[in-house]
Amino acid sequence: MREIISLNENWTLSFPKGDHATEQVNLPHTWNAVDGNDGNGSYLRTTGVYTRTFTAPKQPREGGRTYVEVLAAALNSTVKVNGQVATTHEGGFSIFRADVTDLCHEGENELTIEVSNEDTPSMYPSSADFTFYGGLYRGVNLISVPNAHFDLDYYGGPGMMVTPVPTEDGGANFTIKSFVTNPADDLTVMYSIEDCFGREVASAVRGSADTEVTIYVPDAQLWSMDEPNLYTVVATLQRNNEEVDEIAANVGVRSFKVTPDEGFSINGVPTPLRGVSRHQDRVFEGNALTAEEHYDDAMLIKELGANTIRLAHYQHSQDFYDACDEIGFAVWAEIPFISVFKKGEGAHKHVMEEMKELIIQNYNHPSIMFWGISNEILIGGISQELVDTHHDLEKLCKELDPTRLTTIAHVSTTPVNGPMHHITDLESYNHYFGWYGGQMEQNGPWLDQFHAEHPDICIGISEYGCEGIINWHSNTPQCKDYTEEYQALYHEHMAQVFEDRPWVWASHVWNMFDFGCAARNEGGVSGRNNKGLVTMDRKTKKDSYFVYQAYWTQTPMVHIAGRRHAQRAGETTEIKVYSNQDTVVLYVNGKEVGQQTAHRVFKFNAALNEGFNTIVAVAGDVKDSIALEKVAEEPGYYTLPEFNERQEGVANWFKQVGSMDLTAPMEFPEGYYSVKDTMEDLAKNEEALALAAKAVKLATNFDIKPGVGMWDMMKKMTPEAMSNMISGMPEGFIESLNAQLIKVKK
């Protein structure tokens, strides 16, 4: 029988390049747990060598086969046993295995796994707005199986595919196919389907060389996000009265569809998908999470009220997919085909392999309904090769899995007409109106116009959000002040935008959790993207979290916002409350100051006494309370110093421009730089780069330096294109930059 032995303990990690000390570690492990999000501006991208010993297990009959199973190694790896290469693997997010039987000997064997998180010419991701953690961050197993066993070699798959389809009479057909290595006439495969209580509801037997069967189950319990009923399909390889090998998969019976006018439906019930995106890291742990931490993340998302998760931008842990199956989410799973397209046969092969691994390894998960083929891939420009690769990925998805829908996440600047449309079944845009570009009020009209002009496209929003840092607060929040109040105000608006448009097939907040991005330095917090509804350590739910809980949950709740804005000045102060109840009553120091009937967001103006005040909000049977202190003047530490500095910097920028006519059409004289040149081209001239980098710093607070941080992602962009994505840029700013650039000769 199959034996799975964890090899997660007692590893020695060394670094051949000498850039880190040798250490003893247990798995899961990443060497970027700290520097991947600590704000130093860079992190270690190198090769680490993990080494430990093991004793190869033996099967009773003919010794069997021994496999090393790596649950993920970021980003490239080589597995060796006793100094001999067992396998190599490119890609940092999927399972892979190596048959090491013939490399093992009696007694102790040395297992070495060389892992690198450095870039390669053909690998994805190449450049993106998150940290590429290095290491064996999901664990390693030793698997012992008889010579005849369920497959362990095919793209890291589970050895069985199960396709449950509901029938009109209330039952379901389970089409099952298992894959047997070394089938024989005296071997059979026994299938058993068990309900959630472990009771067998149907079974069948097939020969080991032809294993496919369709089994009917009457009165099937359907799987949905509200009722995630699971069945367990067990496949047992038998020889006479002997069990040779056994595998199992949890599956669900459901049907779903998406239409442009009605959005998403599951089991015939219209159900707009409203949820979040998720990265897989935590503060000072990086991506080396335990199974319990993955489950806790899923529960935090469920408590939010979300019914969908976009798992960005790569294959996630089986622990998290299992949690989604059990708890109930509609999952968008995707590959790291992101930001910058790489030309050539090697890169094309790699991205196709990543899609094969994603689908084959995760086919049985009922929570997964959408395969995402790329994210913001036009940041680096468009080419026919890029478009063709998308068509190839779409075709591959349908060949491997015709039961699910495909989707794509367009960068905001993707033209609404063009070759990137009508490739996938569904489409979504990453829009940040109200943060990087435009105003939050543009989101609804943009959706309405796109829907009217493209009535045949199922449209969603795959990313939207803004930074919210719990140190910063304001009574008059505005874009780019990084306050918790502006983030909450933004999400109040966006939650209503999507509630008013059920035909938007899915919306995904960017992001559920703050996450590591070593290249970032924004809002006074370095090394992280702070758009999360929850902090990276999972300790603090920002006020914006409760906006969605008010919109998306049924269990009565009430939350008083602004509790970290604890010192207030002025005769009165606004107290904002979120609730999914119709009416909220507010008390200040035990006295009722108001009762309101509203939709999700309740605003009260209240006078505070000198010193500390107790604020209580009551909504039906639930209540919340906070303490506020009245002060003569609000402390300066509520305001991000850089916010005022940037405003002063922009003013000084215009002073330097002088009397230029910024209302005149921009000119682009031949032989001189302009805002139409890419950052890569501008970098060829020190003066031109300095002008462009200063403008980007003032507009976004990003430091742009060749070869550093997000340079690879942004080097193909022009200042003109960036201006379409940057919010709050003063009128005439891009014109003033162009006026200065056209003085610099190429």
Regions from the PLM with identified roles:
Residues 149-183, 549-581:
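Surface beta-strand/loop "capping" patches
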Residues 662-734, 738:
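Compact, charge-rich alpha-helical regulatory domains located at protein termini
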Residues 3-18, 40-41, 45-153, 157, ...:
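Accessory beta-strand-rich segments of carbohydrate-active enzymes
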